[in-house]
């Protein structure tokens, strides 16, 4: 079929398999260009490995450290009438390139919140790897099916206490709007913590530990974002922030357990990037377009893959073997460049000035849109989008 982008809300409902493969290859090449990671991990489980920071973690482990990787994700293959999800094609491309270099790669396509996902991962680790020395937890899901009761719990992207009003961009119409979001109820806050908090990370680590598949010295990391006062009302001080604070709680509990065998658990606070997850958060697209322009001008711009490479080589797996620098809450901070005062001051100055007319001039909004489409395999140089492509891509994946 000939596949063109179709946007609905903050999701592109079509994907291009050749474009997704090109994205993965680009990340692999960036990783290889940085050279091998000294003392890097060798057997890595990535929970949430099909896009964004999770995909970049799998790529960095494999192509920066020659690691065997097991990826867990929830994606859809193509049907007769529509292409598969971007994460399906990303994972297929990763599998193809990893195997071409003789690297172990297996994937599990299922609900990562389920008991079955954990049991299947343990089974494959025991059969193929013995143990893992790194576990990356990178799930971003709006819904969690509780594994025992089967109840569906939904997260909310809402402020707490009072309505949130702010300048934002309507990414469908490309105009500046005043966004208004009603505050979360107590139930919505609790539900967001249930979906996006640290409980499932703990359940994964507990299951892996009880099965004896965590190597001594195993490191685990989960991803978070804190941001600044520009995004705090909707993010860190909102329902999502409460969930991310619960991730901090889980990290401390896990670190206490893992440190007994020389391991560690950390939350890594990462910079804002264009992902399917961030595009759903009110105000984030405008903030990202603004902060990217300034960071590019200062030579500080990083995408997912650059961030994760820096986390591996300059935090968790330093060449000299020294311990990672952490903040007062034992977090790895990779948002350090974004939070520089001159970067944030620029955004504070720009915010009241931006209009629909000067949006493209004052910010990198055009680039934001291009990067958003790239997530789904579109707008990539060198690809002929008039070509007929086969949307049916198979790879080494266990679907349960």
UniProtKB/Swiss-Prot annotation:
Enzyme class: oxidoreductase
Biological or metabolic pathway of the protein: Lipid metabolism; fatty acid biosynthesis
EC number, UniProt record: 1.3.1.9
Keywords noted in UniProt: Fatty acid biosynthesis, Fatty acid metabolism, Lipid biosynthesis, Lipid metabolism, NAD, Oxidoreductase
Active-site annotation: 235
Residue numbers binding NAD(+): 48-53, 74-75, 111-112, 139-140, 244, 273-275
Recorded GO MF terms: enoyl-[acyl-carrier-protein] reductase (NADH) activity; NAD binding; trans-2-enoyl-CoA reductase (NADH) activity
Cited Gene3D superfamilies: NAD(P)-binding Rossmann-like Domain (3.40.50.720)
Binding of substrate, residues: 225
A Pfam family that the UniProt record links to this protein: Eno-Rase_NADH_b
Reactions performed catalytically: a 2,3-saturated acyl-[ACP] + NAD(+) = a (2E)-enoyl-[ACP] + NADH + H(+)
NCBIfam families registered for this protein in UniProt: EnoyACPredFabV, PRK13656.1
Family: Belongs to the TER reductase family.
Protein's UniProt name: Enoyl-[acyl-carrier-protein] reductase [NADH]
Taxonomic placement: Bacteria, Pseudomonadati, Pseudomonadota, Gammaproteobacteria, Alteromonadales
Gene: fabV
């Amino acid at each position: 079929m000939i596949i063109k982008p179709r946007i609905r809300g903050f999701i592109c409902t079509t994907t291009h398999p050749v474009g997704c493969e090109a994205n993965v290859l680009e990340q692999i090449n960036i990783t290889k260009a940085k050279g091998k990671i000294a003392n890097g991990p060798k057997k890595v489980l990535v929970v949430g490995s099909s896009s964004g920071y999770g995909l970049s973690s799998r790529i960095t482990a494999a192509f920066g450290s020659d690691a065997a990787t097991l990826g867990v994700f929830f994606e859809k293959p193509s049907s007769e009438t529509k292409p598969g999800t971007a994460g399906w094609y990303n994972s297929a491309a990763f599998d193809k390139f990893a195997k071409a270099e003789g690297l172990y790669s297996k994937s599990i396509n299922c609900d990562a919140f389920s008991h079955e996902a954990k049991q299947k991962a343990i089974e494959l680790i025991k059969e193929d790897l013995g143990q893992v020395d790194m576990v990356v937890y990178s799930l971003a899901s709006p819904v969690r099916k509780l594994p025992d009761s089967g109840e569906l719990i939904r997260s909310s992207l809402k402020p707490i206490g009072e309505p949130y009003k702010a300048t934002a961009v309507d990414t469908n119409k490309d105009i500046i709007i005043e966004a208004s979001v009603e505050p979360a109820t107590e139930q919505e806050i609790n539900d967001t913590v249930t979906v996006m908090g640290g409980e499932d990370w703990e359940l994964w680590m507990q299951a892996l530990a009880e099965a004896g598949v965590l190597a001594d010295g195993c490191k685990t990391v989960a991803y978070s974002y804190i941001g600044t006062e520009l995004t705090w009302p909707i993010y860190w001080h909102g329902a999502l922030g409460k969930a991310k604070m619960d991730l901090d709680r889980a990290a401390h509990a896990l670190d206490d357990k893992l440190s007994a065998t020389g391991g560690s658990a950390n939350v890594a606070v990462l910079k804002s990037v264009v992902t399917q997850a961030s595009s759903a958060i009110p105000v984030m697209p405008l903030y990202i377009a603004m902060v990217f322009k300034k960071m590019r001008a200062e030579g500080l711009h990083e995408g997912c893959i650059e961030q994760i490479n820096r986390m591996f080589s300059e935090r968790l797996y330093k060449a000299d073997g020294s311990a990672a620098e952490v903040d007062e809450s034992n977090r790895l901070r990779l948002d350090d460049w974004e939070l520089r005062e001159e970067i944030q001051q620029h955004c504070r100055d720009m915010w009241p000035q931006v209009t629909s007319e000067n949006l493209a001039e004052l910010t990198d909004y055009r680039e934001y849109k291009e990067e958003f489409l790239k997530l789904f395999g579109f707008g990539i140089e060198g690809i002929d989008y008039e070509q007929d492509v086969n949307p049916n891509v198979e790879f080494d994946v266990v679907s349960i």
